[in-house]
Amino acid sequence: MPATPPNRLGLTASGLLALCRAGFEKEVAAELDDFAAGIGLTGFVRTRPGSAFVTFETHEPVAFADLAERCDWRTLIFARQLLPWFARVDDLPERDRATPIATATRNAGQRFAQLMLETPDTDEAKQQSGFCRRFTVPLQHELERIGAFREGAKGLPELHILFPDTSTAWLCAALPGQAALWPMGIPRLRMLREAASRSTLKLAEAIFTLLSETERNASLRAGLRAVDLGAAPGGWTWQLAHRGLRVTAVDNGPMAPSVMATEMVEHVRADGFTWRPQRPVEWMVCDMVEQPTRIAALVADWIATGRCRRTIFNLKLPMKKRLEAVEQCRALITKRLAQAGPFELRFKHLYHDREEITGYLALRAAAV
C-alpha cells in the first residue's frame, strides 16, 4: 500500500479547469488559453459547447505549489470557478465510485483538509446534485481511512471533485481562499419580498465578488451616499438602502413602494445619462439597458470628474463578440482615466448575469 500522503504541498497538477454558464465556453477557452500562456504554461484547451466547463491540459506536469497562488477564481471574467486539476477518473462503477476516486487521490501524494463535490451548471449535470450531497460523507470517510484527508487541518489544500456525468470525475485542488466562495461558483442568496426586483441579487453578488472585505467595510456603511442611475423599480437602490446608505434614485419611471418605504431614498425623475449630483457621492451604480460603450463612457466620466469615488455597473454584451466588447470598454475607460491616476477596474460574469457582465471601477486611492 502506498504511504500516507504528507502534510505538505507535494501535489503535481496536470492543468486547469474552469466552470462557466453554458454557452460561454468559447469566451472562457480564450481567456484560459491567454491566462495559461501568461503564467508560462504550454498546453491546449478542451471544451464542448453547452458543457459549462473548460479544461486546459499542460504538456508537462506542473508543481501545484507554483500554480495554486496564481489561480484566483476572480482572474477570468467569464469563469465562475478556476482550479488546478491533477487527475481524471473515467468509467466509475455505479456501485463503488469511492474506491477509484480515493485511490487516485492517494496516488497524487497529497493530503487534503476540505472536500467539495460539484457539477457543471447544466440540466444534465445538475441531476447529480442529490448524488453529490449523499456521496460527500462516505467519500470523506474513505479518504480519511487511507490517510488522504484530515478535516480542517491548516496549510492543506481543498479537494474539489467535478462530476460532469455519472461515470467521470475531475479531481482538482485549491488553496484556501483561492476557489470561488460558493460551490460551482453559484451564490446562495435569498430574495426578500421588499427588494422590488430580482436584480437586487445581482448587486448583492457583485458586492461579494468584486469587492474585498476591506472595501466592503469601508464603502458600504451607514451615512454614506449613493446614486442609482436607471433605478426603477428599485432592486439596486433597495440593496444599498438596506445596507444603510442614503440613495438618490434617478429614473423617469416609478419606484416600488417598498423601496420608498425605507425612507432612505430620494426619487429624482430625470435622465440617468445627463443628471449629475451637486456634491460627490461614495457610490454610483448603474444597470441601464444601453450600448456597453455608452455605459463605459458614463461611469468613466463620473470617476474622472470626482462625482463618485467608486461605481458598480452592468454592461450588456453582443452575443457574437463578447470578449471584443469587453476589451473595447476597457480601452475606453483606460483612455478616459489616463490623467486621473491609477485605478481599479474589475469585470465578472456573475451567476445573476446573462448576456452581460458586471464591473467595478474606482481610483486606486479610493479602492480601500
UniProtKB/Swiss-Prot annotation:
Gene Ontology molecular function: any one: S-adenosylmethionine-dependent methyltransferase activity
Enzyme class: transferase
Keyword Methyltransferase: yes
Xref: InterPro entries: RlmM_FDX, RlmM_THUMP-like, RNA_MeTrfase_FtsJ_dom, rRNA_MeTrfase_M, SAM-dependent_MTases_sf
Location(s) in or outside the cell: Cytoplasm
Active site: 316
EC number: 2.1.1.186
GO terms classed as biological process: methylation; rRNA processing
Catalytic activity: cytidine(2498) in 23S rRNA + S-adenosyl-L-methionine = 2'-O-methylcytidine(2498) in 23S rRNA + S-adenosyl-L-homocysteine + H(+)
Source organism, top-level taxon: Bacteria
Function in brief: Catalyzes the 2'-O-methylation at nucleotide C2498 in 23S rRNA.
NCBIfam families for the chain: PRK11760.1
Family assignment from sequence similarity: Belongs to the class I-like SAM-binding methyltransferase superfamily. RNA methyltransferase RlmE family. RlmM subfamily.
Binding partners and assembly: Monomer.
Record's protein name: Ribosomal RNA large subunit methyltransferase M
Gene, per the UniProt record: rlmM
